[in-house]
Every structure is written in C-alpha cells, then in structure tokens.
Regions:
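Patatin-like phospholipase
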Residues: 20-58, 66-362
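Positively charged n-region of N-terminal signal peptides that target proteins for export
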Residues: 1-5
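Bacterial N-terminal signal peptides
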Residues: 7-16
C-alpha cells in the first residue's frame, strides 16, 4: 500500500515539473511605427509576472526585442519613444546639440528627390540616383548608443544578452531570410529594419541585407527552432498578407509589394496571439502613445488565456534584479577606434586634423 502511495506521489511531482519549468518565447512582427504596439504588450506581460525567456523580431519588432534583450525595461522604452527621439531617427536629421561638431549635413532642400551627375564615371557624365530617401546617419548613431554596451557585455553572442535574442534580415544577393544571432547587435537590428527605398541596405560579409519583413515579417519559426520554448507569445501589429490600399502612402505601397507572404499562424495548444491591425502609416510616429496603449490593452485582454498556459510567475523584483546584473557587465560607450574609407590621403589627414586625431593612428 505504501509503495502504491509513494508511486502516486512521485507521479504527481513529475507531472508538475514541466509546468514549473516552462520557457516562454515572445516574437514581434515588423510594421514600422505600428511596432510600438509591442512595448505595450511587454508592459502587460511583465506586470502580470509572465516569464520572458527568449525574444525575436523583425524590423521594428527587432528594435523592441533587442532593447528588451539588452536590459531596457518597457517603461524605459516608452519614455524613449515619448521623448521624440524616434522621430529624429526616422527623419534622418542629426541633433545639432549632440553630433554637429563631428557630422556635417547639407542644408534643407525643398525637393522630394535629389540626383547628382557623376562627371568622373568612365562611361561619361551620367545621373546617379540615390539609394535611399532618408539618411541613415541618425539611426546608425542611435542604435550604436543603445546597443554597443550590450554587445560588449555579451561578447557578440546574442544568447548571452539579458534575454537570448534573434532577428531576421533579408539577403538580397541570395534571395532569402537570414537569422542573426551573433555579431554587432546594432548592426543586426539595423539590417533587420533597412526598409527598401527608405534606408540604405547593410553589407555584412557577402550579404546585402534589407528589412527582414521582405521574407519573414513574423519570425516565430526561427524562434521555435533555435530556442524551443514551451509557450510562444506572438505580438502582431499588422493586418498580415494583404495588398496595399489606395490610402497607403508610396513607401508603404512599395514595401508591401516587395514582401513575400508570411506565416502568422502559431502552433495550437502552446501559443497565444496578441494582434491588432494598427491603422497608421509605416513612418507615422505621431500616435506613438495610442499605439503603445493599444498593445497593453490587447495583451491584458489575452492575459487569462496566457496565464493558463504559464506555470511560473515572476515578480517585478526578479526583472529589476536581472536588469541590474546585466547592466553591471555593460561597459560605457567610448569611441576609441575608427576607420576612414573611400578617401584620398590628403582628405584623410584633413579629417584627422578636423577632429584632432593623432596622425600616428592608422
């Protein structure tokens, strides 16, 4: 009799183990300004003690996921968005109070599109069309500031961030998606959000990388394959595989025409989808607060269903302690190395003199 009771108790204990050891992965779709929706979703998840063990994203989803993985809290993300700096990132304008001493831009031009004549071309004088409509200087600097310390702390391994992270970019040379899990975090995110026509692509090794949304706007399959979470939470801010409408602006239309269909259907039984077709244009950040609030509201509505699937709960002290421990490993951002490319010797020396760099530096 005692043996039967002991076997029954052991069986109950073993049955309870998977529930207490469940791992949760959160995947975030692309969508430009719509992607601010994910910040509200993360707020609700933390507020309700939902464990977040892995994060993944595409385009704007990759930015939000990477910020979370690098130790930024949802409240800090909301504050950054509300400060207005995100509008500066996507405008391409440099803040004169921060960077103008070292970065010089041309004056404002009322023209929508500027083209220059290449008089040194072997083929003779010809027009050279721009590769992008918005300068990437501002967002390149912003992403470096956001992610360089975390890259150093993780030694370039995204599994060693505060939360393991991956994102997806599109390799246009080999015509397919690329899952990014190592390297420079700012470079990976910048690759994932290089919207065609808007920002210039990133060149990494032999790959020419554009926005990950072209091939996979909702990378739940890479997250599931690489991290194997028990529960997947999907945050989707777009309508899905729909053709552009007459109301869409020209950049939205061009991007949607380039996109391949994405699988937005998560596996049944171990997933919860939080979704809204946020009705703003890709670069419209004027409604940021409302977009973030929408994500929070939708996540709260889905919370009863999600909590049924999650055995473990984590309080605010857990998240605060984990962030503090990771930030303690992050070194301060210091620019102590540089490379000048595409310049003649006299031009390189002029730049060094201008920024007062030691001539002995290569």
């Amino acid at each position: 009799m005692l043996r039967k009771i002991g076997s029954f108790v052991l069986t109950c204990l073993l049955a309870a183990l998977p529930a207490s050891a469940q791992k949760v992965g959160v995947v975030m779709s692309g969508g430009g300004a719509k992607g601010l929706y994910h910040i509200g979703v993360l707020e609700a998840l933390e507020e309700n003690g939902v464990p977040i063990d892995y994060v993944a994203g595409t385009s704007m989803g990759s930015i939000i996921a990477a910020m979370y993985a690098a130790g930024y809290s949802p409240a800090e993300m909301r504050a950054i968005v509300n400060s207005g700096v995100v509008r500066e990132w996507v405008s391409g304008r440099i803040d004169p109070n921060r960077y103008m001493a070292y970065y010089r831009q041309l004056g404002s031009n009322p023209g929508f599109l500027s083209m220059r004549i290449d008089v040194e071309s072997p083929a003779g004088k010809r027009l050279r069309a721009p590769r992008n409509l918005i300068s990437s200087t501002q967002i390149d600097m912003a992403l470096t500031e956001l992610f360089a310390p975390a890259t150093a702390a993780a030694d370039g391994d995204f599994d060693r961030l505060m939360i393991p992270f991956l994102c997806v970019a599109s390799d246009m040379n080999h015509r397919g998606p690329v899952v990014m899990r190592r390297g420079d975090l700012s470079e990976a995110v910048r690759s994932s959000m290089s919207i065609p026509l808007v920002f210039k692509p990133m060149k990494v090794d032999s790959m020419l990388l554009y926005d990950g949304g072209i091939y996979d706007n909702f990378p739940w399959k890479p997250l599931d394959r690489d991290f194997r979470p028990d529960v997947i939470v999907g945050s989707i801010c777009t309508e899905g595989n729909t053709p552009p409408s007459e109301q869409s602006n020209i950049m939205d239309q061009a991007f949607m025409l380039a996109m391949h269909d994405t699988d937005y259907t998560l596996p049944e039984g171990r997933s919860v989808t939080i979704r809204r077709a946020v009705d703003v244009n890709m670069l419209d950040f004027d409604q940021a607060e409302a977009i973030m609030d929408a994500g929070y509201e939708d996540a709260m509505a889905a919370m009863p269903q999600l909590l049924e699937k999650v055995g473990e709960r984590r309080d605010s002290a857990y998240y605060a302690g984990r962030r503090e421990a990771f930030r303690a490993k992050c070194p301060p951002l210091i620019f102590n190395d540089y490379k000048l490319e595409g310049l003649k010797r006299t031009q390189r020396e002029y730049i060094r003199d201008f920024v007062q760099v030691d001539r002995r530096t290569p």
